[in-house]
From Swiss-Prot:
Protein name: Queuosine 5'-phosphate N-glycosylase/hydrolase
InterPro entries listed in its UniProt record: Q_salvage (IPR019438)
Function: Catalyzes the hydrolysis of queuosine 5'-phosphate, releasing the nucleobase queuine (q). Is required for salvage of queuine from exogenous queuosine (Q) that is imported and then converted to queuosine 5'-phosphate intracellularly. In vitro, can also catalyze the release of the q base directly from Q as substrate; however, it was shown that Q is not the biologically relevant substrate. Shows a very low activity on queuosine 3',5'-diphosphate, and cannot release q from queuosine 3'-phosphate and from the 5'-nucleotides AMP, UMP, CMP or GMP, indicating specificity for the queuine base.
Catalytic activity: queuosine 5'-phosphate + H2O = queuine + D-ribose 5-phosphate
Family recorded in the similarity comment: Belongs to the QNG1 protein family.
Transmembrane region(s): none
Gene for this chain: QNG1
Hydrolase found in the keyword field: yes
Top-level enzyme category: hydrolase
GO MF, one example: hydrolase activity
Length: 341
């Protein structure tokens, strides 16, 4: 992929040429200070992925890796037109919305004996079967069900042809390199090719490919096949929630023109200049927050419990956004429907 900037290079280039989205250095420091208080706790450790989320697999085995692959293959566009009227999945006495509604639906299907994490099943699954698997417990369906069906079929067929039907084989081919795994995923599976143009350059975000690498690292607890020596090279996952929380915390600022658009709920399109700026600046902002946090930890003379990387910051900030939804209502997220995030 000649002339294509990787996610970190892309975000730096976008932030340097942005017209409507800006990174606030004071806000970056404030977010780093907020995270400093969490540096010694479970929130910023790889183990937190399982400990803090009951829907994620408990095991660190092939079945768990294949669960991660299916959920991240479908990990896009969960926002609802109205917050009080949305897709909800009830599972084991609890209700889940957003991304967690997908995880609950996958677990519900497995409990019902539907082998949704098996490539030989989802390579040929029908649209009606997908509608049933992803059914909502409200009258609001999960968005983009037809696209999810198409992508499951396409991805399942490729996984069977190239990797013997198991994502663990793909992980093993990457030889403990996060970058190699990310590129293998992007090259093998078309729906993961999150690439666009900005100022005449080809830029990449690879949101789902990066989160797939991160979740594989997390489900395998950073051990064995999941011990990626270059895991810190993975950046945050540029979606529609992270920019909202970064703006809420004052690390990201929008121009009046863009803010007006977002407040009106105008839809952006994938590859629009402003959409690219929001994603690129968010990604670079988290890189700066990480650098600042590591400096603060060093100044305090503390040793973190493990490696602090952009993945763990993303996990924490995403959970923060989920837990502070009410506080963040005044800051709009950017509305877009696409398969990349």
């Amino acid at each position: 992929m000649d002339g294509l900037l990787n996610p970190r290079e892309s975000s730096k280039f976008i932030a340097e040429n942005s017209r409507d989205v800006f990174i606030d250095s004071g806000g970056v420091r404030r977010v780093a200070e907020l995270l400093l208080a969490k540096a010694a706790g479970p929130e910023l450790r790889v183990e937190g992925w399982k400990a803090l989320h009951e829907l994620n697999p408990r095991a660190a085995d092939e079945a768990a890796v294949n669960w991660v692959f299916v959920t991240d293959t479908l990990n896009f566009s969960f926002w609802s037109e109205q917050d009080e009227h949305k897709c909800v999945v009830r599972y084991r006495g609890k209700t889940y919305s957003g991304y967690w509604s997908l995880c609950a639906a996958v677990n519900r299907a497995l409990d019902e004996g539907i082998p949704i994490t098996s490539a030989s099943y989802y390579a040929t699954v029908t649209l009606d079967q997908v509608r049933n698997i992803l059914r909502s417990d409200t009258d609001v369906s999960m968005p983009l069900v037809e696209e999810r069906h198409r992508i499951l079929n396409e991805t399942g067929k490729i996984l069977l042809e190239k990797f013997g039907g198991s994502f663990l084989n793909c992980v093993r081919e990457s030889e403990n390199s996060a970058q190699k795994l990310m590129h293998l995923v992007v090259e093998s599976f078309p729906s993961y090719r999150d690439v666009t143009l900005f100022e005449g350059k080809r830029v990449s975000f690879y949101k789902r490919a990066q989160i797939l690498v991160a979740d594989t690292w997390s489900v395998l607890e950073g051990k064995g096949d999941g011990c990626f020596k270059d895991i810190s090279s993975i950046t945050m996952f540029a979606d529609y929630r992270l920019p909202q929380v970064l703006a809420h915390l004052g690390a990201l600022k929008y121009s009046d023109d863009l803010l007006k658009k977002l407040l009106k709920g105008e839809m952006l399109s994938y590859g629009d200049r402003q959409e690219v700026e929001i994603r690129g600046c968010s990604l670079w902002c988290v890189e700066l927050i990480r650098d600042c946090l590591l400096e603060l930890i060093e100044q305090k003379g503390e040793k973190p419990n493990g490696e602090i990387n952009s993945i763990l910051l993303d996990y924490y900030l995403w959970d923060y956004a989920h837990d502070h939804r009410e506080d963040m209502k005044g800051i709009p997220f950017h509305r877009i429907r696409c398969i990349y995030y």
